[in-house]
Amino acid sequence: MVRLHIKRGDESQFLFDTSVIVPVEALVKQITAIYNGILKIDRICSEMAELAEHDLKLKDEWEERCVPSGGSVFKKDEIGRRNGHAPNDSMKKVLQKTMEEAKALISKKQAEANVCVTLEMVKEATDQLRGAVMIVYPMGLPPHDPIRMEFENNEDLSGTHAGQLVIQEPESQLWWAGKELQRKQKLSDYVGKNEKTKIIVKIQKRGQGAPGREPVISQEEQKNLMMHYYRRQEELKKLEVDEDISYLNAEWADSNSLKRQFQGVNDIKWKPR
């Protein structure tokens, strides 16, 4: 299997395994779906954190119907987005634990651990979040709640920073080695037929131009190189200081040397043999 390290810009996103015979068209669809799915989970978790702290969005006719299991605890939302009737501590922990598990499943740290992310993992994380919300809110959330809208794919991200991060599949491009992978080609047309190939692929929105090339050395390698040069510089400084004071160990610099010679005790050793 060919391993693709997916990035957007210089930021690592996830690892993805595929085959050299896969059409680029299918590859674009798969990678874009995973990328957007990860963004969706991040948005849901962000809203769920607010839900766990401050309950539903503002006071409306749904407040009496959508009551969290086990009752609520009033916790005022300082920014005024939610009504402040938060779930109790046990239900709050259900939401928080599920959020942690879902985010860990699709975390960017998976790439550091050499674990690939699949569309099934994205769906699993989404289902976990949906299940946790159903446990805490068995009557469901209001139709206008951002979390429910995300689950139903009715979210409105127009004019938001989150909306700028999303890449619609028709506008999605994949780049490798400064070249756009054309949808009519196969991956093997670019990387050859070696199934053990590992490459860095960058996802980009159409019209934004070619993404920047990868640096010759990674940030970690650059950090280690700078540390090496720093240590070497400190060693050279120490050697210079040692050379400056090395004459103090010379015989001619010993102020008592002449006195010992006159007394005839210059070569006497005091340590037992």
UniProtKB/Swiss-Prot annotation:
GO terms for cellular component: cilium; cytoplasm; cytoskeleton. Disruption phenotype: Morpholino knockdown of the protein results in loss of cilia-driven fluid flow along the anterior-posterior axis. Multiciliated cells show loss of coordinated cilium polarity with many cilia pointing towards the anterior instead of the posterior. The planar cell polarity (PCP) component prickle2 is uniformly distributed around the cell margin, instead of being asymmetrically localized to the posterior of the cell. Keywords: Cell projection, Cilium, Cytoplasm, Cytoskeleton. It is found in: Cytoplasm; Cytoplasm, Cytoskeleton, Cilium basal body. One of its GO terms (biological process) is regulation of cilium movement. The keyword Cytoplasm applies. Belongs to the CFAP298 family. Plays a role in motile cilium function, possibly by acting on outer dynein arm assembly. Seems to be important for initiation rather than maintenance of cilium motility. Required for correct positioning of the cilium at the apical cell surface, suggesting an additional role in the planar cell polarity (PCP) pathway. May suppress canonical Wnt signaling activity. This is Cilia- and flagella-associated protein 298-B. It comes from Xenopus laevis (African clawed frog). The gene is cfap298-b.
